[in-house]
């Protein structure tokens, strides 16, 4: 669920999802359109795509099992949906960590009105 995703982001990046990622670029936070602005925004775009494939799952509310060992996030056993949601979140949190060196403050509270044009396909 979203709280677990927030904790994963915090474990990986040492930053809270709010405010650092909740309104970042065109894809971090709710929805999205246009082109991802940078590597961080691309992580969020890919996360949206990952969730988009899980149409039969409650991606924002289903609880799943995960742990952190030796600095790596590990998804635990659960229902198919729980495991898939966890993997989407784990991959995104890891992606956000890898993108920390290109994080731009100017995209932190980016206005949706700047996200124009066609969206990429997943």
From Swiss-Prot:
State a single Pfam family of this protein: Phospholip_A2_1
According to UniProt, the tissues expressing it are described as: Expressed by the venom gland.
**Where, in this chain's numbering, is Ca(2+) bound?**
27, 29, 31, 48
* Family matches, as InterPro entries: PLipase_A2 (IPR001211), PLipase_A2_Asp_AS (IPR033112), PLipase_A2_dom (IPR016090), PLipase_A2_dom_sf (IPR036444), PLipase_A2_His_AS (IPR033113)
Gene3D superfamilies associated with the record: Phospholipase A2 domain
Active site (record annotation): 47, 89
Q: What is its EC number?
A: 3.1.1.4
- Compartments in which it is found: Secreted
Q: Provide one Gene Ontology cellular component.
A: extracellular region
Its required cofactor(s), as named, are: Ca(2+)
> Carries keyword ATP-binding?
no
Query: Is Calcium among this UniProt entry's keywords?
Result: yes
Q: Which cysteines are joined by disulfide bonds?
A: 26-115, 28-44, 43-95, 49-122, 50-88, 57-81, 75-86
One annotated GO molecular function is:
phospholipid binding
One record GO biological process: phospholipid metabolic process
Superkingdom to which the source organism belongs = Eukaryota
User: Which SMART domains is this protein grouped with?
Assistant: PA2c
Q: How is the cofactor bound?
A: Binds 1 Ca(2+) ion.
User: From the record, what ranges are coiled-coil?
Assistant: none
The entry's keywords: Calcium, Disulfide bond, Hydrolase, Metal-binding, Secreted, Toxin
Function as written in the Swiss-Prot or TrEMBL entry: Heterodimer A-B: Nigroviriditoxin possesses phospholipase A2 (PLA2) activity. It consists of a non-covalent association of a basic PLA2 subunit B with a non-enzymatic subunit A. Subunit B: Snake venom phospholipase A2 (PLA2) that induces myonecrosis in mice. PLA2 catalyzes the calcium-dependent hydrolysis of the 2-acyl groups in 3-sn-phosphoglycerides.
Q: Which family does it belong to?
A: Belongs to the phospholipase A2 family. Group II subfamily. D49 sub-subfamily.
Task: Describe the protein's quaternary organization and the partners it interacts with.
Answer: Nigroviriditoxin is a heterodimer of an acidic subunit A and a basic subunit B.
Q: What is this protein called?
A: Phospholipase A2 nigroviriditoxin basic subunit B
